[in-house]
UniProtKB/Swiss-Prot annotation:
It comes from Mus musculus. The keyword Iron-sulfur does not apply. The modification N-acetylalanine is found at residue 2. This is Putative lipid scramblase CLPTM1. Mice overexpressing Clptm1 exhibit an aberrant development of thymocytes. Residues 1-51, 618-664 are annotated as: Disordered. GO terms for biological process: cell differentiation; regulation of T cell differentiation in thymus. The modification Phosphoserine is found at residue 601. Involved in GABAergic but not glutamatergic transmission. Binds and traps GABAA receptors in the endoplasmic reticulum (ER). Modulates postsynaptic GABAergic transmission, and therefore inhibitory neurotransmission, by reducing the plasma membrane expression of these receptors. Altered GABAergic signaling is one among many causes of cleft palate. Might function as a lipid scramblase, translocating lipids in membranes from one leaflet to the other one.
Amino acid sequence: MAAAQEADGAGSAVVAAGGGSSGQVTSNGSIGRDTPAETQPQNPPPQPAPNAWQVIKGVLFRIFIIWAISSWFRRGPSPQDQSGPGGAPRVASRNLFPKDTLMNLHVYISEHEHFTDFNATSALFWEQHDLVYGDWTSGENSDGCYEHFAELDIPQSVQQNGSIYIHVYFTKSGFHPDPRQKALYRRLATVHMSRMINKYKRRRFQKTKNLLTGETEADPEMIKRAEDYGPVEVISHWHPNITINIVDDHTPWVKGSVPPPLDQYVKFDAVSGDYYPIIYFNDYWNLQKDYYPINESLASLPLRVSFCPLSLWRWQLYAAQSTKSPWNFLGDELYEQSDEEQDSVKVALLETSPYLLALTIIVSIVHSVFEFLAFKNDIQFWNSRQSLEGLSVRSVFFGVFQSFVVLLYILDNETNFVVQVSVFIGVLIDLWKITKVMDVRLDREHRVAGIFPCPTFKDKSTYIESSTKVYDDMAFRYLSWILFPLLGCYAVYSLLYLEHKGWYSWVLSMLYGFLLTFGFITMTPQLFINYKLKSVAHLPWRMLTYKALNTFIDDLFAFVIKMPVMYRIGCLRDDVVFFIYLYQRWIYRVDPTRVNEFGMSGEDVSAAASRAQASTAAGALTPAPSTAVSGEDASTVPKATSGACTASQPQEAPPKPAEDKKKD
């Protein structure tokens, strides 16, 4: 059971990057454009299902980040931050835009990061006058929000993977953002923020083909781009929605004391010391699946810009969510995968009932506890196991084979570093189990490549002398009648209908796909041994119980979060196997009155243990008699030697007196 779960768990960690959407409705109501046919990537090779538990762990990690930032924000400024240069105390600042200030909004679109061409009418995308700072009741929906939609005519540089920026200016009513208009421009009456609105994403191309015919279903244009740019191409992508939030905040911030990541949004004026209104570009609800690539076939791009006020606590949540993970030093691939995991979280938040979502978070905490307890009890069970009676040794070796195939598969598919490390640790644990089920020695007379000692494996005596070995061999012989034909059929199917990078990749993907589909069959030998022995007392029931509970929790996650059908079937089949274990535990229950080969029953052993414990307690409460011993008599008393074995050794008799010798 553990082996199949490890295969499913590792397989679910390898997730392919999501593609573009076709006619999809985004979370804020806009409809995404269809991706042009020539930009569609090739059909990726079948990838394992995403792991629901990894998604939930991401939610918990983000909740912790939000809590940490909120606690940091509520904390008072530290004393050392209260003094500025020269030891002068720092004074709490104020917002340069008081509440209910009349504002004008100017939105410009440009290819340049630094915008100066205010006279270009083509650059002005949206202009909204007489907005009220802190107004939550105006707008079409009486929520303080406004929006503007238009088609952007994009230049050739943007079509050829260039960047495009949005420049947002808020000015007090009666002023203009152009510094060259001296009469209408005021520095303290203008707040500006810009951002690149296209997003660069990696598109990976794996050159695959049918190994028998040499043909491929990949787009010829994609093959040509892969030859020109390599297997990984960075392509500009577009999403048609972006929201401009102005934070309704008048906190007396102190310069130098704003906690991260909030400090990157609070901008202070160098002269007055006050801070500008906080502008936040909110694209949190823009799902990755709604992005589509920008290429030369697109002459225009749709853009819907929304303006909404934002409360302080919601801004803190968004700022914490947009903060990059500290694990980004492991590679950009991990960051891209975290974006896809965030998409799963967002979909769950949008489509799941709040009560069910709260229950899922609570159960996920229980899942983490069970996961740790299952790991701890598994290690303790194998570490303290002295007899292999009733345990399938071959299943342990098959588990090592499964873990090794999974490791080679994720290395061949260039999965991120964290997944590789986790699978490698699992392989080491499985290899350690071999030393507990077999006698492993190093033969230094025979060396591998003349350098490394050759390991030798020998069955333990407790395994050879028991009937378990016979039943284990019999179970795997019956199992081979099923596995090998299925393996042959799957290999032929994979060779005829699937594309691969080469023969090595075909072997790995064929073995991995076979184990992922039929790996649960390897749990049946232990069921067969239990049936033959008519006993389940030899199984690590604590570990199995924790893993079964985790499987039931995975069932809940699989139906709360969108998962492939094969993943849900995998959870169901593990449940079925565990119910068979429970049925065997019920029919092969332990009989305390049964007499073993030594003529003892479980009741006799328990009664003897109780009597021994009672006599020990009584002896501890009864004081030993004390007698006075003279010096001469004391010399004749034998001295007790230390050690536990002296009580069982016979003592020599004292020498006989002379009168007794004469009588003899």
